[in-house]
A protein has these predicted regions:
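Pyridoxal 5′-phosphate
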Residues: 1-414
Length: 414
């Protein structure tokens, strides 16, 4: 299948790389080639400095004090919420809930909406490509409520076909939970079309944007999803911060996932009433500095240019497809049109862990294992693969280094 590389204009990747201090280090005496962005991305100096400044100059708990530091921290925290709102083009900051991760965000919907709304025989449609974080919470509902999971397939190229998805929908379908972009294959799912079809049938849709939000602009109003989740550490921000976007009506339907401070309106000896969203879903002290750091990470992505990032990564993906095809005995899993910058692969006869360890000695960081996507790997008949995932700072020279190291690994185990 031909995938011509799109032209990339005015993208200075070397200037971008200088913003990430860790990229200047060496590993085993070799320059670091970091290709594990699908697991977690590196942080620009802006984010590192922001986190240090917040702890050094304006740290206090938020929404709980009238003193100077509390007001400063609250203002910075809520400014981060506004930055997330703009990043997703959400209608209001009240649609933006801070969590600790995408995983917690999905569980918030599963427990807050799925548990009270779904019952015996109701169906939840997910795809075979889902990360375990978008599988296991729905299994909880299957086990406790008697709901059923229905799996939308992919073809042998890892492509997602809308006509196959529609066949999964029945009068018992009560929820759709779907990835925006596969973390193992890079397949991009037509979530806007899915939401259009779902809307006609009155089915709510959760989109897992843990990968999608990193690699393409996202407009939740245009997609028209009911919920959208993403995680900060993949967006070049700190770990420990995630985001749940929810439509106003859906958030008001949901019961709180956790109880504690801030999420209440009133507590008495015999009853409790809950705060309005988003605070209803932010029990306890939130990830304050992590949220502030995420806001500045999104600022950084906007500065570089989200369309420019997408074009750079598309060009890199096309080049990687070409270079990896030159490695003898290497099989790439997933070649869907328009795929994102993720490559899962194996070298015939060599375990993924062994390949990863050998190329690590060349300074190259990839992931080896199941990528928290065991049903997908089973569908392709493998138990583990290596995964190279590219970000806004990766280069063609690093793709060359990967291809050369893989050829060396193949010969090493021959």
């Amino acid at each position: 299948m031909e995938h011509p590389a799109p032209p990339v204009a005015a993208y200075d990747v070397e200037a971008v790389r200088k913003d990430f201090p860790i990229l200047s280090r060496t590993v085993y005496g070799k320059p670091l080639v970091y290709l594990d962005n699908g697991a977690s991305a590196q942080k620009p100096q802006l984010v590192i400095d922001t986190v240090a400044h917040a702890y050094s100059n304006e740290y206090a708990n938020v929404h709980r004090g009238l003193h100077f530091l509390s007001n400063a921290a609250t203002e910075a925290y809520e400014q981060a919420r506004e930055k997330v709102r703009r990043f997703l083009n959400a209608p209001s900051v009240d649609n933006i809930i801070f969590t600790k991760s995408s995983t917690e965000a999905i569980n918030t919907v599963a427990y807050g909406y799925g548990m009270p709304k779904l019952g015996e025989g109701d169906e939840i449609v997910i795809s075979i490509m889902e990360h375990h974080s978008n599988i296991v919470p729905w299994h909880f509902i299957r086990e406790r409520q008697g709901a059923k999971l229905v799996w939308a397939p992919v073809d042998d190229d890892g492509a997602f076909h809308i006509e196959d998805f529609v066949k999964c929908l029945t009068e018992r379908t009560k929820l759709i939970a779907i990835t925006h972009m596969s973390n193992a294959l890079g397949t991009v799912v037509p979530v806007k079309e899915i939401c259009r079809i779902a809307r006609e049938r009155g089915i709510p849709v959760l989109v897992d944007g843990s990968q999608g939000a990193v690699h393409m602009p996202v407009d939740v109003q245009d997609i028209d999803c009911d919920w959208y989740v993403m995680t900060g550490h993949k967006l070049y921000g700190p770990s420990g911060i995630g985001v749940l976007y929810g439509k106003t009506g859906r958030l008001k339907e949901m019961r709180p996932f956790m109880g504690g401070g801030e999420m209440i309106e009133e507590v008495t000896e015999d009853r409790v009433t809950y705060n309005d969203p988003p605070h209803r879903f932010e029990a306890g002290t939130p990830p304050i500095v992590q949220a502030i750091g995420l806001g500045y990470a999104l600022d950084y992505m906007e500065k570089v240019g989200r369309e420019a990032i997408r074009a750079h990564e598309a060009s890199l993906t096309a080049y990687a497809r070409e270079r990896l095809s030159s490695v003898n005995s290497l099989r790439v899993f997933g070649d869907a049109p328009g795929k994102g910058s993720i490559f899962s692969f194996e070298i015939a006869g060599i375990h993924a862990h062994d390949v990863s360890m050998v190329i690590d000695r060349a300074g190259i960081a990839v992931r080896a294992g199941t990528h928290c996507a065991q049903p997908l790997l089973k569908r392709f008949g493998v138990t583990s693969t290596c995964r190279a995932s590219f970000g806004l700072y990766n280069t063609r020279a690093e793709v060359d280094a990967l291809a050369d190291a893989l050829e060396h690994a193949r010969k090493f185990f021959a």
